Amino acid sequence: MTEIRPKTPLTYAQLRTMAGQELGVSEWTTVDQNRIDQFAECTGDHQWIHVDRERARRQSPFRTTIAHGYLTLSIIGALALGMGIVPENTQAAFNYGFDKVRFLAPVKVGARIRLRTTLLSMEDRGPGQYLMKAANTVEIEGEKKPALMAETLVMLYERRKRAGA
């Protein structure tokens, strides 16, 4: 797996002015069979198209195993963190949900993927609380069609300054 090096995070003030702007592109990461197998173990989804290399070679239209769509979707969080998308001075960031998730192309075993993210909005949800909505595209190296597109919703809690600090 490719190591993802964190970049300098943006501030809340910067993000509030960046709707419609691309936040960045992640490093490439390889989706190998071990990663697919571990995801199958965690989720109980042992469908042959993901874990049986020989059968996939013979019977799959892709002639190899492919990553679970939900595995590809779940990788978004780690790739986004590596891009410095979570603002500095964040106390906590929680997944709030997804909108418009579309699985557009299979990720074949051994493929390299990366994340491209555009900020859609930063909505105030109370003192120091923001709902960040971003458009995400997971690209497959060497392929024209992306693996998936999804809008992520992340609830951010800004670290509060302590009285007297």
Roles of regions detected by a PLM:
Residues 37-40, 73-77:
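Predominant activation on well-ordered alpha-helical scaffold segments within soluble catalytic domains
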Residues 24, 28-30, 102, 153-155:
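Generic structural detector for well-ordered beta-strands
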Residues 1-18, 106-165:
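HotDog/MaoC-like acyl-thioester-processing domains
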Residues 2-67:
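Catalytic strand-loop segment that frames the active site of acyl-thioester-processing enzymes
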Residues 27, 35, 45, 90-99, ...:
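A generic structural signal for short beta-strands and their flanking turns/coil linkers
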